[in-house]
Amino acid sequence: RTISSAASDVYKRQVYVVGGLAPDSDQPMPMAMQNNLSNTWQHIQQHIPGIEFNYEFWNPASNSVPRRSTYPACRAVLAAKVQDANIEDAMILGIQRAYYLNAKNPSDVDVLSEIAYSIGLNVEKFKQDINSPAIELLLKEQLQLARQLSSQGFPSLVISKDDKLFGIQLDYNNSATMQQAIINVINVEK
């Protein structure tokens, strides 16, 4: 098989699993953590060409109040997928744009609802679903699965083959190394 056909086969069976690094909180993120994340953004921007961030999110004079709360964004992805399985990618991208480029807080349901509207979801249904027991159950199941996959961070790429899990090292500057790692997993004999 060629790299592109094998990678295409893998892509067809991809499954997103939300990782949920931080549970619900309305408390402001500690300043030390804000500084650490801002520095992480700078590091990423220096090492991955073309990456952009809007640092206004971390500006104390701005209207944003950073919180360490990723579960709302995870629920938003799940609620979008429940409403339309083909729109999961659009919700993920919308959340990333809101956070990284538009300095909007992805733990705010209003921000997540704006994204839902922008990608064509029924916003009223989305608002009901995001806080529903069904989505909460899905979130718990996904968090459990993320732990079982032994992901070392997020995002992660894990391939399941023959009941074995293979972590793929992410390389944002050279996709060929990831493609080759995927091919190597595909070609592993039982």
Question: How would you label these PLM feature ranges?
Answer:
Residues 4, 29-30, 172-173:
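Short, glycine/charged-enriched secondary-structure capping and boundary segments
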Residues 1-7, 11:
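Single conserved hydrophobic/aromatic residue that forms the stacking wall/gate
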Residues 27-167:
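Thiol/selenol-based redox catalytic cores and closely related redox-interacting motifs
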Residues 162-190:
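Non-catalytic, surface beta->alpha helical segment in thiol-disulfide oxidoreductase systems
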Residues 12-22:
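A short beta-strand-loop structural module common to alpha/beta enzyme folds
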